[in-house]
């Protein structure tokens, strides 16, 4: 069970709602517009274009590489050898970067990056639920960005603007659940613990709402998802960080792994180029699941079971789940998630935790075999401890959340999921690997 003090959990819940709003789970539209963007009429037309773009979305399913179709066992052996990183040490010649992440109330995990020459430092969230790289610009003089570090393009010798002429540039308008921002785009070098990524496309925030951004404990977002397949600007000019890393052959293995701790005093971790056996229970098998959509790190979800209650969902319909390092909880469509939550009769004083059911997520692995991932009450119940009277309160780490089409409906496997299963994201083979997390170190 994950423990929080009373004030911590209250913040966890609120910050989750705020942070999920800033994840680009909703469509982001890029169009070329005049630089006089602040004109109300222009903004109205811009929003209309955003809605029209949404209508064009089609579910984009991808398949395993054809060369593996007739030799899936060989493929699995190949991929497991390829990821022998879990079972053995990486040779010194392998290039990888590791970063410990600041644990902010067990709800957000914050890392460091540098941009430009000379480098300018920023606190960011690494977010697999987004492909956008967004950092406040010095051009942003009001709203939520005023309290954060801001990138000064004029001070970087390596910055390149996408400005075509004095009157025209490409902007991105992002509408979130409770806020909005406007970004212009440029290119500069990015540094992560010694790894240099050349000419990465960066979204520079030039305007954003006060709420929720002013309250967030980080400066920006580094999206680790895929470029929007339906957005021609993104796929051609605005590649995500992991796509740029792969394109520039910076890592021998185009994978990254994410660890979420149980304890508040422990750091989270992200590693590019390998997984770390420190974070996996020794002897546990990695289960690999094929990515089924280029919108997210999205995998097939065959069902969710409560074995002791003869309860199941998703068995008669196609469900899908996005593994998202930027979300705190496990969420799903209200029509499916609410019956599940109602069947978990948790007492708020935590008195009946031992009698609560195991929740089982049924998935299909890369071999086409059924895999069941079990979550005990200790995994999905969040406990609040009061420092004043030594009492406890408990809440369920599951929540109903309706993501509108075309991105939804979809389940989100956030940090409650990743805390139980150390997660590996394979951008070479478009796979998600999970293995039981080791928290005893």
Swiss-Prot record:
TM region(s), chain numbering: 8-28
Presence of the UniProt keyword Repeat in the record: no
GO biological process annotation, one example: proteolysis
Localization per record: Membrane
UniProt enzyme class: hydrolase
Cytoplasmic membrane side: 1-7
Domain annotation Peptidase A1: ranges: 109-435
EC number: 3.4.23.-
Cellular component, GO, one term: membrane
InterPro entries: Aspartic_peptidase_A1 (IPR001461), Aspartic_peptidase_AS (IPR001969), PEPTIDASE_A1 (IPR033121), Peptidase_aspartic_dom_sf (IPR021109)
Organism domain of life: Eukaryota
Biological function: During the development in the mosquito midgut, plays a role in sporozoite egress from oocysts.
The name this protein goes by in its record: Plasmepsin VI
Naturally occurring in which organism (per UniProt): Plasmodium berghei (strain Anka)
Gene that specifies this protein: PMVI
